[in-house]
Amino acid sequence: MSLSRSLDLTQEDYAVQDAILQYISSNFVSLKPPDVKFFKRHLENVTKVLIQMMRKEDNLFNLIFQKERVAGSFWDKLKIGHPIEFDKNFVLTLPPALYKNIKFTPASPSYVTVNVQNGLKIVKSSKCRTYRPDWFDDNGNILSDKLRFWMESVVNKALATLPPLPNKKYQLEIEGTCYEIGTRKSGPAVTVEVNIDSSGSTYLGITQFCIDLVPAFEFQTKDWPHHIRQCPADTQDKTWNLVPKPLKPEENTADGNIPARLQWRLSFHNQESYIIHNLNHFKAVLKLLKKLRDVKFDQYKMSSYALKTVFMLEKERQNNDFWRRPLSSTFLHMLTVLTEWYGKGKIPFYWDKQHNLLGKLSKDQIKQVYCTLQKINNRIYEGLQSKCESKCDHFIIASTLLDSEELLKIKKDIIVDRSGNKPLAKRQRCS
């Protein structure tokens, strides 16, 4: 059942809900421009200096580091709340001979092994300065864990040149601004935690942020793995990446008992950014559902990437006009679609349908989320379907997206013309 089609709402009904959702987006979801400007400036300052330090302290990094690539929800304009989490890929290059006759073999779903046996013979004989014997096994497979550990060591080695602080962090000063910096492990990334000393600044918001630095190898379209969905033909930037995302034992389902340390995660941020761009309400609705997730669930049970994948899969089923429908209509439809995926117990990875993004959850956890989503759907339906003005709850969708304090604010700030169920008006305040 599609909830948005089952509701018998007029254009005015949708206009009321659209106005409410637009208010929610502006006040409780969208990033504030001053915050974005503040954190982007400090992000670029810290990243630039950190790269310089890493180049200076590690000769191999200096030789193989190519560029930084943005990744993640902030750069796709899908971040909600505060811009305090950033993702950057540090693109590294292999010795040129290794790119010839490189072989990608399917492993666990969304993972491959990378074999460079043929090129390795040339590299060994040429005494290549960027060759690291410990990055390869005896069969010429590149070891993902070695790259991950190496990247962590380079970051920590660079930070160790800074003045130490009592809390196992370091002090970095850039153009008169002091930063307190530390690191922690996070999947394939080295997470750099930054605390800004904002004394003397007029900025009064949050002053902590973090950067997930992910080492990545970049490849061209000619190397695109054949066993997955192919690259969109009209994507301008067709380069793609492999990242050393670690596999948990229960996630390693590769045939032939391929060790986790040989497996590399496929990553297609460039292509995904293209797929979701310029689609009217696509991003607005996705961010509203992320807001619902933050209020009702936790990120472990409903990851941001799983939500994004649900939307990319739905884009395959809909034409572009679908995303031009009223904001509330699209929201209700996608809420139902999300519910249906949890009902199936599977959200397939967009590029490799064999990978279930809900696979890390137990059946009971999936059922729990599904039942909660069903209750939310039913509650919204019951709140909106009544044509009796006294019974219709105009704030029913808002009540599922907001916490109690936010809901109180929206009810104070805006009113509904109940005489004709007209769009909202700003509540007048006495001066």
Swiss-Prot record:
Mg(2+) binds at residues 85, 87, 212. Keywords: Antiviral defense, ATP-binding, GTP-binding, Immunity, Innate immunity, Magnesium, Manganese, Metal-binding, Nucleotide-binding, Nucleotidyltransferase, Receptor, RNA-binding, Transferase. Its EC number is 2.7.7.86. Pfam families: Mab-21, Mab-21_C. One of its GO terms (biological process) is innate immune response. GO terms for molecular function: 2',3'-cyclic GMP-AMP synthase activity; ATP binding; double-stranded DNA binding; GTP binding; metal ion binding; RNA binding. It catalyses: GTP + ATP = 2',3'-cGAMP + 2 diphosphate; GTP + ATP = pppGp(2'-5')A + diphosphate; pppGp(2'-5')A = 2',3'-cGAMP + diphosphate. Mn(2+) binds at residue 316. The keyword Transmembrane does not apply. ATP binds at residues 73, 85-87, 290, 304-308. InterPro entries: Mab-21-like_nuc_Trfase, Mab-21_HhH/H2TH-like, MAB21L/cGLR. It is an enzyme of class 2 (transferase). Its cofactor is Mg(2+); Mn(2+). GTP binds at residue 212. Nucleotidyltransferase that catalyzes the formation of cyclic GMP-AMP (2',3'-cGAMP) from ATP and GTP and plays a key role in innate immunity. Acts as a key sensor of double-stranded RNA (dsRNA), the presence of dsRNA in the cytoplasm being a danger signal that triggers the immune responses. Directly binds dsRNA, activating the nucleotidyltransferase activity, leading to synthesis of 2',3'-cGAMP, a second messenger that binds to and activates Sting, thereby triggering the immune response via activation of the NF-kappa-B transcription factor. Belongs to the mab-21 family. This is Cyclic GMP-AMP synthase-like receptor. It comes from Frankliniella occidentalis. The lineage of its organism: Eukaryota, Metazoa, Ecdysozoa, Arthropoda, Hexapoda.
